[in-house]
Amino acid sequence: MDNDYLLTVESLSFGYTRERPILKNLNMRFRRGAVVALMGGSGCGKTTVLRAIGAQVRPQQGRVLLNGADVHRLDREGLYAARKKMGMLFQFGALFTDLNVFENIAFPLREHTDLPGSMIRDLVLMKLHAVGLRGASRLMPSEISGGMARRVALARSIALDPPLLMYDEPFAGLDPISLGTIAHLIRNLSSALDATTILVTHDVAETFQIVDYAYVMSAGEVIGEGTPAELMASTDPRVAQFLNGRRDGPVRFHYPARPIAEELGL
C-alpha cells in the first residue's frame, strides 16, 4: 500500500443488475490531506462512489481500501469503526428537524464517544465557531436559512475530526454568498484537520478554486483526471463539453428520435 494515499478505489464495478452497470472498473486514489472532486453529469455514478466507499452498496468486483483495509470485507464491528472515521455532508444537509443547531452537532459526539457533557459543549461550540454560527446554537433548523443549514451540517460532519470527509453536492441550491462561504470552509477545514476530502459536485468554477485534483466521470467511468489546470487543457471532447457547459457534443442535445419531418408526416 502507498502510505501517501488514505483511500484507494481499485477496479470497482457496481450495478443493481449486471445488465445495467452504474460503475465500470473505476480506479481512483485519494491522497492524504488533499481535496479531490468527483465531477460529471447527472446520473454518471458520482454519489454511488461515495456509497461504495461507505459500504452502503457492495460492488460486483473491485476493492475500496481505507488505510489498506477493504471496507467491504470488514465485519460489523470493523465497519462501524471505519465509518466513525468518515464525515458525511449530505446533499440537503439532513439535519434532525426536532433538534436545535447545538444538539445536531452534539449528536455524533454523544453517540460515538464517552466524553463528559462539559467537553461535548466546548467541542460543539468550537465546531460552530469554525463555521461562523456559534451565535445560532439554540436555533431550530426551521429558523435558519438554507445556507446556514448547510454550514450546520458541515460542522456536524467534522464533529469527530474524521480523517475522511465526503461532501455530496454541497453547493446545490445556494446563493452566491453562501456558495462562496461553503467552498471557503471546505478548503479551510480540510487543511485544519489535515483531512482527505472528496467533493461530489457539478460546479466547475467554484470547485476548481479549492481542489487539488479532480476526476471527471461519464456513464460510470473515469474519462479524465488531473489538476484543474490539466483538466481545463484536456482535448477529450467529453471532458471539454462538461467543463465548458457546451449544449451539444458527445452528449447530444436531442434525444434519439426519427427525423421531425417524418414524425410530422411532411
Q: Where in the sequence are the language-model features?
A:
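Helix-to-loop junction immediately C-terminal to a conserved catalytic motif
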Residues: G54
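A short, proline-enriched helix->beta-strand linker immediately N-terminal to the Walker B motif
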Residues: A159-P163
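Catalytic Walker B motif of ABC-type/P-loop ATPase nucleotide-binding domains
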Residues: L165-D168
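Conserved ABC ATPase signature
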Residues: M140-I144, M148
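Conserved ABC ATPase "signature" region
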Residues: A69-D70, G117-G135
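The feature captures the beta-strand-to-loop junction immediately N-terminal to the Walker
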Residues: M39-G41
